[in-house]
Amino acid sequence: MVVKVGINGFGRIGRLAFRRIQNIEGVEVTRINDLTDPNMLAHLLKYDTTQGRFDGTVEVKEGGFEVNGNFIKVSAERDPENIDWATDGVEIVLEATGFFAKKEAAEKHLHANGAKKVVITAPGGNDVKTVVFNTNHDILDGTETVISGASCTTNCLAPMAKALHDAFGIQKGLMTTIHAYTGDQMILDGPHRGGDLRRARAGAANIVPNSTGAAKAIGLVIPELNGKLDGAAQRVPVPTGSVTELVVTLDKNVSVDEINSAMKAASNDSFGYTEDPIVSSDIVGVSYGSLFDATQTKVMEVDGSQLVKVVSWYDNEMSYTAQLVRTLEYFAKIAK
C-alpha cells in the first residue's frame, strides 16, 4: 500500500523532505502547495547550494511538474481549507510553511476535502504530541490527527539528553546551539521583518546571538527533564551544519569514558556516534538527527561535584528533515 503525502510549503524543509521521500518505498508525494511560481519551485528543487544537485529529472508541466517521470500537482492556495488534498489521495500533510504551526491552524488541512493526518515541521505547542523519532515516537498510538516534529535543535538535543539522563540522571543543565544562519536573517544589514535587531544584521558576516526554545521544549519530548534545562543560540556564518553543547550536573560522578560508552550504547539510526575530529562541513547531508562527538566530552571537578559537557552535531537542514520523514513514515504505518 502506497501512502500519499502532500507538502504545504516548498521551502528548505519541504524540498529536502521531497528529496528524501523519493528514496522511500511505499511513500509518494502527490501534491505540493506553495504560493511561489512552479518554475521557481522546480529550479530550487533541482539546484541546491548546500545539499547539492537533485539526483533525478525535474520538468515543469502545466499544473505542476514531473519528477523522474511522475507528475506532481502544484497548487497555490493561501488557506489550507481550500487545498483539495483528497483529489490526489493525500492522507498525510507535511505542514512546512511555518505559518500553520499550531494545532487549530494545522487542522484546517483536515477540513472539507482535506487529509487525515498532519505533521507540523516546527514546535507545535502543548496541545499536540511533540515527537523526536527514536527518542519518544512510541507516545503515538495512531489516533492522533496532528503531531509536531519539534525543531531541528530539539532533534539534536533530545537523544543526547535522554541518553545522559537514562545513564546518570540530569539535575540541571544549560545548552548552547552554535547554529548556521537561516532564511529569517538578513544577508546584508537591513530591517528585519520580525523587528529583531540582531537578525537585522548580516547573517553571513556576524555571530548573531539568538533565542532557542529547544531546551525548554525538551519537556514535551522527555517529561522527566521538564524545567531542568535552559539555553540559547549563537547563529554563525555557515549556510548549514550546526552543533549543540550541553553542560549539566548529574546525580552521580562520572568519567569521560563512562559518558562516551553510554552514548555509544544509545546510538541508532537517529543518534549517531563518532570519535573522528570532524568539523561542520563534514556533517552536511547526514541523516542522523544528532551525531554525538566523543572527542569533545569534558568533565570538571567542582567542590566534590562535577560539571559535564557533551556535544552533538547536526545538519540543521537534512538531519531534521530525515527525522521528520522517519516520523511521517511511522505515523502513516500506525494510523487508525
UniProtKB/Swiss-Prot annotation:
One of its GO terms (molecular function) is glyceraldehyde-3-phosphate dehydrogenase (NAD+) (phosphorylating) activity. Its EC number is 1.2.1.12. The record marks 179 as: Activates thiol group during catalysis. SUPFAM superfamilies: Glyceraldehyde-3-phosphate dehydrogenase-like, C-terminal domain (SSF55347), NAD(P)-binding Rossmann-fold domains (SSF51735). Keywords: Cytoplasm, Glycolysis, NAD, Nucleotide-binding, Oxidoreductase. The keyword Nucleotide-binding applies. Gene3D superfamilies: Dihydrodipicolinate Reductase, domain 2, NAD(P)-binding Rossmann-like Domain. Pathway: Carbohydrate degradation; glycolysis; pyruvate from D-glyceraldehyde 3-phosphate: step 1/5. This is Glyceraldehyde-3-phosphate dehydrogenase. Binds human plasminogen. Its main location: cytoplasm.
